[in-house]
Each structure stands twice: as structure tokens, then as C-alpha cells.
């Protein structure tokens, strides 16, 4: 019990004293109840001016005595454990169970309320006979803790405290991907509302957009396998209906059964559908990871300023990034009523047509611009040192920028021309890097020349500085000195284009200095892709039908959102951790269950991992002293517990205490996976 006060009276003029008690309901949630109302503080203090302080001290002493008795009881339990029969399980080792997923479950249930969403989907809109929320949350948590295929994840379920997916068959795991695909839009909408509630925002000011490709470890594309997207026929029927209603197709284009018949209009319609690339998903195409030999899928990701996903879109591996951007933005606007925001994107998506498209959707833009494509007048202004504003950090100039107002981005057609603000930047570190890359390219070209390698004209990368005498593919003759010197002169320079949303009230929504700094934020979405690929198992994919592919991507996107939200909370509380540190700390949450008579005890343990990081140059004595000092501070796992609103368990706890720390009600029957119980 503990002492609490509350206001009362007609105008809240009185303070009342009461005894309170904490308890857990049937769902394991912490609740509070009034044990006794002691009365008004002003009356109680008449006989003892320090009444409230003395009362609190009394119950604190009672609490301390309770803790002392618990410690004595714990000591007796440890002594009992040390004397257990060593031959009870024929010398087999005790199982090691993970419980880091309970911290993720806390975010899933209490911060984002995703358990409610999936229970609602199952209750109202699916025929699932299994616990959909249990399977989806388990797959999502495992993407963070130890990403693998669905098949491997199913086999790994017995290594987790609380048996999160006990009794659910493998087929249900794959079926959950079908439900994820079917309800993707409603799930992402709910996810966004929950995220905005956590961040205290109503809409994103800056929206980051980029595209990546993921590969499949299979030799054949969907076209070569004859495997259409699962929803292709439905999408085709929708396109036919729209074409008929708009007059693109007329009655003469159909036979009596409603099938398309050959003809000019029909042929044009089929070509349009083929250009949309909606029939096949896994196709060969451009790959930033140079996996041109494998089928790919294209993923367009939209994130907010905190790096938390807003939505994603999946396209065929051979679809054009330029063409799919319009479809993604249109869908984003319809689903989330996004307007007056600024879309931030890399230069690979910067075209006059896309900029015009964004403006027509009442969106602004902030995109990287190739400095090699600037006109002669603008290039001259870029090299002119006059007008540049220095960017100072820690008393030292690290970069400088210049703003060119009313600059025109030229399109293929006059109608696509867009007036905007051009921001030119120069960075000494970037100059050093660019020059180093050019030298590497130069040596590579000379090496390729000696090998008799052929290149095509207007190639990118190292081949762009290779000299040839033919207009087609030809042998390298040396270094194209003119191109090489032009690239050397551009080293260190970069640019971006900016324009606010057409209907935005504040025409100077982003100050010039903020524009220059925003250039560095373009890497944020690339970081999200790296996290999903390196830490969350986005690729390679081990599913093949289009619905399961999109379900898998949704799982990875939600996992990214959970990690980014957790990282945001850590930064806000002044205890920042990297994504790698968060994952490593979660995986260190391991416990050994031990039977002590009829009671189940849990001994916390973990394997030391890379504890020398950052201390490699210290002597053994210095290292021991530094680690001893660090152990007096909360470790990373303890920080995570505090951030999500849980309490880390002591080194040795019983079943009830373990459940209390993890915010759940653990029972003897459910705490240990069924197949592991015989190991105790």
C-alpha cells in the first residue's frame, strides 16, 4: 500500500488523504484501488502538523520491511536451487528463453494499440480460425530480433518465454500474409494514427520518398514462370471498366461474353496495361545492389521527419521510378488527405514532369538536383564565390550555400517547365570524397584499357571518363581528359530544388538555411532501406506469390516503424541508442527457467557481446576500471525497459515477479513452451 492525495470540495479547495493499493487485472494491466479514505488533510494535520510526511514514512518503512523479508525468502530459494538433483534431467542443459519480445509487445499493445486492430480485423472481416494478432506480432517481433523465413520463424517459436504462438500451425503463418495483403491500407492508416498520437502531430510537414529494389534468390522471373500477380485479374477488370466508362473502349471492343476482341482501340488499351507493368511482379530490372541476374521487386517508401514509415507501394522490378511516383503520390493523397506538405526525394526522381505532378497535387518539393545538368549561366553562378553563406559548426566553416530564386527547371515540353528555388551548396568533405572517387575511377579505366574492355558511350560511373573513338560500344583508348577535368571542377558541389505547396499560406515555410541543411536529411530514407535490408530481413525474400510478398514487406515496414518510434522515445528521454544497439540489447534479454520444488524461478543471464567496443586501445586495468564505472549506470536493456514503461527483472525472480516486470500475467502452464518443459 502507499499514501496518495487528491483534491476535493466544490471548488477543489480541500486535499484528501487516502491509502491506495496497486494490483493487476485479469489481463495483467496495472490498476489502482482505494483501500481507505483517511479524511481531509487540514483536519488530520491539526493534531500533527507533519501528519502526511509521517504517514508516508510509516508506509515506506513497511515497504522496506517487506523487501527485506522478500530478500531473505529469495536467499532461501537460491540455497534450495543450489541443492537441486543434478541427475533430474540426465545432465541435459537447461533451456535459454528470450523475453525481449515483451518490450516490443508493450509498444505493440499499449503504445500503438495494434493488437486491437488485428483483433478487429479477425472478428469483423476474416474467417481466420487462428489468433491473427499473435501470429502477425510474433513475425514482426522476430524481424527485429532474428529475421528469417516464415518456415524458420515457425520452427524457432519454442525459444521464447510465454510461448507467444503456441498451438498455431505453419499454414496459418502463410495465411496471415494473405490477410495482411488484403487489409494493408486499413492497417497502415491505423498505424499512422497511432504514430501521430505518440508524436503529438496531426500531419507531416516533410515527407521523404524514395524507391529501392529487393531481389529473390531464384533464376526465373514471374513472366518466365507464367505466374501473374494474384490480384491482376481484378485490377485488369477495373481498368477495363474505367476505359469503357471514359469512352476509351466502346461496345464494339467486346464480344457477347464480354471479352475483348482485336481492334485498334483494344490494341492501344492492351499496350497501356502492359506499360503499367501490373501483370508480373518479380522481374529483372535496374538494381542498386547490382543483382541484374535475379528477379527484383520495386518498393516505394514514404516516411516522416522522424524516419517512421507513412506508407509503401510495391511495383514490378522493371517498372520506371519516374512513372510509379505519380501513382504513389496520388494514392498517398487519397488515403491520407496529404496536402501542403513538402516531398523530399533524391535526384533520381527529379524530373520536370514529377515536379509539376507534385504541384498539381497541392504538394511542395525538395529534391536533389544534378549539378552536371545545370545550364551555363547557373553553372557560372555556382562557381562564383560571391553570394555564398557559410555554414558554421563548432566555430568552423564546414560548408556554404547560395540561393537562386525563380530558377526554372526545364522539362521536355514547355508546359512542364517549373519555376522554383535552387540552392547550391559546397562541402569540403564532399569535395575530398569526390576527388578520391575520381582517382579510383581513373585507375580503374586504365586497368580496363589494358584488359581490352569495351564500354558504351555516355555510360555512368567509372565508364563516364573512359575515352572511345566510336559512337557505339568500343575499346577504351584512355582517359577522357575533358570529362575528367569537368568532374574534378564539380567536386564538392551539390544542389537541390525547392518550391512550397501552391496553396500553402506561408510562402517561406522553409528558411534558406534550413533548405541547405535539408540536403543532408535526404540520406534518412536510404538509412531506412539499409535498416530493413540489413537488420529486418527485407531481402532476400523467401515467399513467391505477390500477396505474400506484399504481406512480408508490410511486416518489415511495421517493424521499422516500431524501432524508429522506440529510437525517438530514447532520444526524447536523453538516452539515445542506435538501431544496432537496440536490437543487441533486446536479444540480450534471456532467462533460464529453473524448477525449485513446485515453484518456477527465472535466472537472468546473457552472453557478453562486444563489451570492448570503443575501448580497444585501453590496457587491461584501464578496461576493467572503465567497465566497473559503466556497470554503476543503467545498461542498455534497463534503459529500454524504462523507455517502454516496464521494470527490468532482478537476477533471480519467481513466476509472478517475472510477469509483473514484463507487464503480463504469466501462468505455469503458459510460461514455458510445451516442447521445452521436459528440459526443466
Task: Label every model-predicted segment.
Residues 26, 160-167, 200, 305-308, ...:
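Secondary-structure transition/capping motifs at alpha-helix termini
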Residues 514-542:
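Short amphipathic alpha-helical "interface-anchor" segments enriched in bulky aromatics
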Residues 313-335:
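Active-site beta-loop-alpha junctions of metal-dependent nucleic acid enzymes
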Residues 1-277, 293, 300-313, 318, ...:
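Dynamic "connector" segments at or just before major functional cores
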Residues 258, 265-266, 294-297, 314, ...:
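An anionic, glycine-rich sequence signature occurring as long contiguous blocks
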Residues 19, 153, 208-211, 307, ...:
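Conserved structural-core and active-site-/substrate-pathway-adjacent residues in large, well-folded domains
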Residues 39, 545-566:
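Basic, amphipathic alpha-helical segments enriched in Lys/Arg and hydrophobic/aromatic residues
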Residues 320, 344-353, 371-373, 547-550:
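Acidic, metal-coordinating catalytic cores used for nucleic-acid/nucleotide bond scission
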